[in-house]
Amino acid sequence: MWNQIYNPLGSAALSTLAAAIPVVTLLVLIASGKVKAHLAAIIALILANLVAIFVFTMPANMSIRASLLGVVTGVFPIGWIVLNVIFLYRITVETGRFELLQRAIGGVTTDRRLQLLLIAFAFGAFFEGASGFGTPVAITAAILIGLGFSPLAASGLSLIANTAPVAYGALGTPIQGLASVTGLDPYTLGAMVGRQLPFFSLLVPFWLIWAFAGFRGMMQIWPAILVTGVAFAIPQFVISNYINPWIVDIGASLISMGCLILFLKVWQPKELWLSPKLRGNDESAATMKPPKPMDTTKLTQPQLWGALLPWIIVCIVMLIWGTGMFKSWANAIFVWNYPVPELDKMIMKVPPVAARPTPEAAVFSFTYLSFTGTGMLLAALVSGVLMGISPAKMIVEYGRTIRLCAISLITISAMLAIGTLTRLSGVDATLGLAFAATGVLYPFFGTLLGWLGVALTGSDTASNVLFGNLQKITSEQLGLSPILMSAANSSGGVMGKMIDAQSIVVASTATNWYGHEGTILRYVFLHSIALACLVGVLVMLQAYVYPFTAMVLK
C-alpha cells in the first residue's frame, strides 16, 4: 500500500513546480510546432514517470502499471470512437452521400457563419449530449472540413463550440461523477450548473462567429446568433432545473437547431460570407485547394433522405447507446473488468484531497458492446450496407482508416497515460491544492481548478472525480457553498476542453491535418483562458454579490 504525498519537497511552491513539469512540457512542445504531437506526448510521459517516481516517491512498478493502464484506456474507449467516426465519414465521401449533405446544408444556407452555428454549435451539442468523449469534435470537424472549411477553422472552431454543452455530456455523466465523489445530490448539482452555463451558451455562439469572421462579420448575423444562443440557453436552464440533468444537451440542441433552421426560412443576411478561411492569418489556408462553389440545387426527396440517412442512423444509435438501460443490457452480455495487479486499491488518496483515506481504483473495464465507438461502428456498417457498399469494400476502407489514424491513436494513448499517471501519483492533486490556497479569491481560482482538471485529463467527468471532493472540502472550510463550488468545477472545466491535448489530436485527425496540433493549440489557447476567467468572474459574483448570490442553491 502506498499513500499519495502532496508536498514531497517540503515546500508547496517547489512541489507545485515539480508537479507542473509534465503538463507544461507537453503543452510547450506541442505549441512550439517543432515536435510532432506523438513525440511530445511520449517525452511528457517519460517525464511524468520520472517526477512520479523520484519526486513523489511512487513505486516504479506502480508508475509503469499506471502508464500502461492509461495507454490501453486511450485506445478503448477514446481512440475507438475517433477511428469509427473517421470510418463513417470516409464511406459517406466514398459513396457521394457527403456531397449530397453539402448540398442539403447549402439549401439551408450558403453563409459559412450560419453553417458554423448549425453544425459546430447546435449539431455538435447533440452529439455531446448523446455520447461525449470526443465524438462531437470528431464529427463536426469532419463535416466542416468536408464542407470546405480550412483545416484550422474546422478544427479550432469545433473545439471552441464544444464548450457550453460539455458539463451535461454523455447523458449527464460529468454530473453523475461529481455527485459520486462529493455525496451531493446530482439533481441539485445539475441545476446549479444550469444557473451558470446558460450565460455562456448565449455568449459562445457570438464568440464562435467573432473568432471566425471578426466583429463586423459577427454583427451582420447577430439576429441568427441570438436565436441560436437563446434557443439553447433557455432550454438548458429549464431542463436542468425542472426536469433532470441527463437530457439537457439533447433537448437544448434539438430546440436550438430547429429554431435556427426555422428562423433562416424568414431571414438571411444581406451580405453572404462565403470564405471558408479564418479572418486574418489562417496558415492552413495555404494547404487548401480552391473551394468549389457550393451546389445549392434543391435536392429531391430521395436525395435529401439519402444525404441525411447516415447521420440519422448515428443519432438514433448514439441515443440508444447513451442510455443506462442499454448499457446494463449490453454489459450483462459481455463485460471484462481487469483490476491491475499491484495497482488497484493499492494507492491511498488521503486528506485534504479526500475526506478520509480512500483507495484508488485501477481497473480496465472492457465493456466492448456498450462502448460509444462500438455504436459508431455499427452505425457506419448499417449505413454502408444501406448505401450499397459491399462488405469487402468496407473492410478495405476500414484498413485505410486504421492506417490514417495510427499515429493519432498512439498520441491519444500516450496522453491518456499521462492523465492516468498524474491522477494515481497525486501529481495533479498537488496542482489542485495550489489553487485551493487562494482564500477569498477561491471562487475564481476554484473555477480555474476545474479548467486545469479538464486540460490535464481531457474529460469534465475525470476532472469532477479528481477535484470534486477537494472543492467541497475547501469551500466548507472557507464558508462558501459546496454546491456552488462543486458546480463551478464542472462549469469551469468545460472551457478547458478545447486545449486538452487529446481533443486537439481528435480535431487534427478528423480534419486530416495531423502534425499541426501546435497551430491548433496556439489558436484556441487564449480563447480557452479568457472564457474560463469569465466563468470564474461569474462564480465570484455568485459567491459574494447580490443578486447573483440568490442564484445559489442550498
Ranges and model annotations:
Residues 301-449:
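Transmembrane helical segments that form the transport core of multi-pass membrane transport proteins
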Residues 7-21, 74-78, 131-136, 188-202, ...:
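Structural signature of hydrophobic alpha-helical transmembrane segments
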Residues 113-125, 151-164, 185-202, 211, ...:
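Alpha-helical transmembrane segments of multi-pass membrane proteins
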Residues 135-143, 159, 173-183, 210-212, ...:
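Re-entrant/interfacial helical elements at transmembrane boundaries that shape
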Residues 1-9, 264-307, 333-362:
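Intrinsically disordered, low-complexity non-transmembrane regions of multi-pass membrane transporters
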Residues 65-73, 78-147, 388-474:
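Membrane-embedded alpha-helical segments and adjacent helix-loop junctions characteristic
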Residues 167-279, 491-554:
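Juxtamembrane and boundary regions of transmembrane helices in multi-pass small-molecule transporters
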Residues 18-27, 35-57, 79-85, 225, ...:
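Hydrophobic mid-bilayer segments of alpha-helices in multi-pass membrane transport proteins
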